Amino acid sequence: MNFPNGKTVKKVREMYPAGCRIVLDHMDDPYTKIPEGTQGTVRDVDDTGTVIPSWDGGGSLGIVYGEDSCHKIHTEAEAKTTLDWYGKYQPEADSRCPRCGERMPGPKGRHAISRWADITVCDQCGTIEALEKAGLTKTLPMMEWFCIRQAQNGGGEWKG
């Protein structure tokens, strides 16, 4: 196996910053139990260019540069899967709205449930989503939600 040079490793680190969400395309390991299409959160890229994720289903088997492949989430379906996953781990109180990034004071149950994903959003975004659902305003693509944009562009892992 040939290891990538420092310039290549730097490029991989820029492509997959810590916190970004990825989808496994292929893993050339006959012993892995991680199915293609599984999503995870990038933790690091090591000095050999291996992308180290935390897979949503558990585990942290790395994606070896030149052997395996993955991509950052880039479709609405992939964004919805990520938002649904984030919703399972959303803080119970005083979190941030995943759609606009504003603080949501108080308990999670006091705010709106998104009409597009299984996650809680702030009251204002809940109202906007109701208008979107009624066809009265243009729908904001899930790839444009604050929590997706921030994580995909090097802002670190979304923690709500």
Residue ranges and their predicted role:
Residues 2-13, 17-76:
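Basic/aromatic-rich interaction segments and small domains that mediate binding to polyanionic partners
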Residues 36, 91, 116:
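Exposed loop/turn and edge beta-strand positions of beta-sandwich/beta-sheet ligand-binding modules
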Residues 76-93, 133-160:
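Short, intrinsically disordered terminal segments enriched in charged and Pro/Gly residues
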Residues 94-95, 119:
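Residues immediately within or flanking Cys/His clusters that coordinate Zn2+
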Residues 97-100, 122-125:
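Short cysteine-rich clusters marking metal-coordination/redox-active sites
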Residues 105-107, 131-132:
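Short, non-ligating residues that shape and space the ligands of small metal-coordination modules
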Residues 108-119:
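Short linker/helix segments within small regulatory modules
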Residues 123-133:
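Short Cys/His-centered divalent metal-binding micro-motifs
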